[in-house]
Swiss-Prot record:
Protein name according to UniProt: ATP-dependent Clp protease proteolytic subunit
Principal subcellular localisation of the protein: cytoplasm
Catalytic activity: Hydrolysis of proteins to small peptides in the presence of ATP and magnesium. alpha-casein is the usual test substrate. In the absence of ATP, only oligopeptides shorter than five residues are hydrolyzed (such as succinyl-Leu-Tyr-|-NHMec, and Leu-Tyr-Leu-|-Tyr-Trp, in which cleavage of the -Tyr-|-Leu- and -Tyr-|-Trp bonds also occurs)
Pfam families: CLP_protease
UniProt cross-references to InterPro entries, sorted A to Z: ClpP, ClpP/crotonase-like_dom_sf, ClpP/TepA, ClpP_His_AS, ClpP_Ser_AS
Domain of life: Bacteria
Alphabetical keyword list: Cytoplasm, Hydrolase, Protease, Serine protease
Family according to the record: Belongs to the peptidase S14 family.
NCBIfam families xrefs: clpP (TIGR00493), PRK00277.1 (NF001368), PRK12553.1 (NF009205)
UniProt entry tagged with the keyword Protease: yes
Compartment(s) of residence: Cytoplasm
Origin species: Lacticaseibacillus paracasei (strain ATCC 334 / BCRC 17002 / CCUG 31169 / CIP 107868 / KCTC 3260 / NRRL B-441) (Lactobacillus paracasei)
Function: Cleaves peptides in various proteins in a process that requires ATP hydrolysis. Has a chymotrypsin-like activity. Plays a major role in the degradation of misfolded proteins.
Amino acid sequence: MLVPTVVEQTSRGERAYDIYSRLLKDRIIMLSGEVNDQMANSVIAQLLFLDAQDSEKDIYLYINSPGGVITSGLAMLDTMNFIKSDVQTIAIGMAASMASVLLAGGTKGKRFALPNSTILIHQPSGGAQGQQTEIEIAAEEILKTRRKMNQILADATGQTIEQIKKDTERDHYMSAQEAKDYGLIDDILVNKNTQK
C-alpha cells in the first residue's frame, strides 16, 4: 500500500511526514484493516505515546475494520482503559466483530459513528483440531471468551447479558442510528463541528 506524504513548511524549511505520523501530531490514530498482533502493537504504542505526551488531552481513534484476533483487540481495549487520556472512538465505514467492541470501549460520551457506518456484533468464532481432549479444551476456551465478550458489551452498552447473548447469536448488523439506540455509540457525527 502506498502511504501518502504530507509536506509542511517550517522555520527551517520543508518537512515531509507520512500521513499517519502527521495525524498522530493531532492525536489521531487510524485503526484500519484486520485486528491482529502487529496492528495492536502499533495502536498500543501510539496510545501510550500520546498519553505520556499529554494525558489531559483526548486521543481520537478512527476505526474502519472487519475485526480479527480477539486477544489482540483485548490488548488494545485494556490499554484504552489503562491510560489516563480519554479515548474518543469514531467508526468510519465498518466496525465489525472485535472492532465493534473497541468502538464501544471508548470513553463513555465520546463514542461516535459517521452516518453511513455499519457496525456488526456477533459471537466469537474459531476452530480446533487434534485429539478429543484438545478439542474440548478449545471449545471451553471459546465459550469462556464468549462470556467475557458478552460482559464487555453489556457493560459498554447498558444492555443485559441475556440481550447481548441473543443479539450476538448470529451476525447482527446495525446502522449508525441503530448502534446509537443500542448503546454501542453515543452520537452520530455529521460533520466535525458536531464532535465534542
